[in-house]
Amino acid sequence: MKFAAILLVTCVLFSLLPSHLSQGEESSMNIDAQRRPWCPSKKQVFGGSCGNDGAQQCLNNLLSTWDPSVRLSPVSCNCTPQPNNNILCSCPNMICP
C-alpha cells in the first residue's frame, strides 16, 4: 500500500515537472527577445549622434543589448543620423540565432 502511494506521488511530481520547465524556457526566450531587438531586421534606433566614429558607436550599442557571445563573430555596423537626436544602426552581417 505504501509503495502504491509513493508511486502515485512520484508520477504526479514527474507530470508537473515538464510544465514547470517549459515555463522557465518561455521566460528565458522572452528575456532573449528583449535583449535582442536587432533581429530579424538587424537595425535599431538609438538616442544620440553618430559622431566621428558612428560605426563604433553602433557596435557599442549592439554589444550593450546583445549576448556577449556576439563578440566572437566579426560584426560591422553603419550609423545613419535620424531626426530628434537619434541614430539608426544597421549591422547587416550580424548573425541572428
From Swiss-Prot:
- Pfam families per the record? SCRL (PF06876)
User: Calcium: present as a keyword of the record?
Assistant: no
The record's Gene Ontology cellular component field reads: extracellular region
Disulfide bond entries: C39-C96, C50-C79, C58-C89, C77-C91
Question: Which keywords, in A-to-Z order, does the entry hold?
Answer: Antimicrobial, Disulfide bond, Fungicide, Plant defense, Secreted, Signal
Q: Which InterPro entries match?
A: SCRL (IPR010682)
Cleaved signal peptide residues: 1-24
Q: Tell me the compartments it is located in.
A: Secreted
GO BP field:
defense response to fungus; killing of cells of another organism; signal transduction
Q: Does the keyword Nuclease apply?
A: no
Question: So what family is this one in?
Answer: Belongs to the DEFL family.
Record protein name field: Defensin-like protein 245
Gene name for this UniProt entry = SCRL4
